[in-house]
Curated annotation (Swiss-Prot):
A cellular component term, taken from the record's GO annotations: membrane
Protein name: Tumor necrosis factor receptor superfamily member 17
UniProt entry keywords in alphabetical sequence: Adaptive immunity, Disulfide bond, Immunity, Membrane, Receptor, Signal-anchor, Transmembrane, Transmembrane helix
Species this chain originates from: Mus musculus (Mouse)
Gene Ontology annotations of biological process type: adaptive immune response; lymphocyte homeostasis; tumor necrosis factor-mediated signaling pathway
Transmembrane segments: 50-70
Topological domains annotated Extracellular: 1-49
Function: Receptor for TNFSF13B/BLyS/BAFF and TNFSF13/APRIL. Promotes B-cell survival and plays a role in the regulation of humoral immunity. Activates NF-kappa-B and JNK.
Tissues expressing the protein: Detected in spleen, thymus, bone marrow and heart, and at lower levels in kidney and lung.
Segments on the Cytoplasmic side according to the record's topology features: 71-185
InterPro entries on file: BCMA_Tall-1-bd, TNFR_13C/17, TNFR_17
Cellular compartment(s): Membrane
Pfam families to which the protein is assigned, alphabetical: BCMA-Tall_bind (PF09257)
PANTHER family: TUMOR NECROSIS FACTOR RECEPTOR SUBFAMILY MEMBER 13/17, TUMOR NECROSIS FACTOR RECEPTOR SUPERFAMILY MEMBER 17
């Protein structure tokens, strides 16, 4: 009985073992015919060649793209410095000029005061809840509490006490104010 061998092997009944087909391609057994057929071998080799070429080109193109982007960033660092610092600001140089002007004006007085244009700015809220509610106190901006945010839920709990031996009133009776006093004097 012949043993099951791999696709590229045949069973040698003299040795009772599987042997590679490439050893018998000059006179192949029936199981090695597809492996040793030159037309099948060349088509498989052609497929592997196409795959290796595709993989090589992909690797070369990705390395070239990375190198070009790296070189462009190194050659043009001024473009990154000119970008606006805050999302609402369109011209970053105008903000720096304003800061320099305020800084020179402040240096005549107290050195510990920093210009307001260098402070961190927060954009105004544009949602309906923020527009309807007015900020309180000295704050320029309104930050809603977590329970007021969209999708938040509020947990409401009630306290119950031991009313002695009488039964505890139901929640509906407590809410409606219909509970009867348990202790009478």
């Amino acid at each position: 009985m012949a043993q099951q061998c791999f696709h590229s092997e045949y069973f040698d009944s003299l040795l009772h073992a599987c042997k590679p087909c490439h050893l018998r391609c000059s006179n192949p057994p029936a199981t090695c015919q597809p492996y040793c057929d030159p037309s099948v071998t060349s088509s498989v080799k052609g497929t592997y060649t196409v795959l290796w070429i595709f993989l090589g080109l992909t690797l070369v193109l990705s390395l070239a793209l990375f190198t070009i982007s790296f070189l462009l960033r190194k050659m043009n660092p001024e473009a990154l410095k000119d970008e606006p610092q805050s999302p609402g600001q369109l011209d970053g140089s105008a903000q720096l000029d304003k800061a320099d002007t305020e800084l020179t004006r402040i240096r005549a007085g107290d050195d510990r005061i920093f210009p307001r244009s260098l402070e961190y700015t927060v954009e105004e809220c544009t949602c309906e809840d923020c527009v309807k509610s007015k900020p309180k106190g000295d704050s320029d901006h309104f930050f809603p509490l977590p329970a007021m945010e969209e999708g938040a839920t509020i947990l409401v709990t009630t306290k119950t006490g031991d009313y002695g031996k009488s039964s505890v009133p139901t929640a509906l009776q407590s809410v409606m104010g219909m509970e009867k006093p348990t202790h009478t004097r």
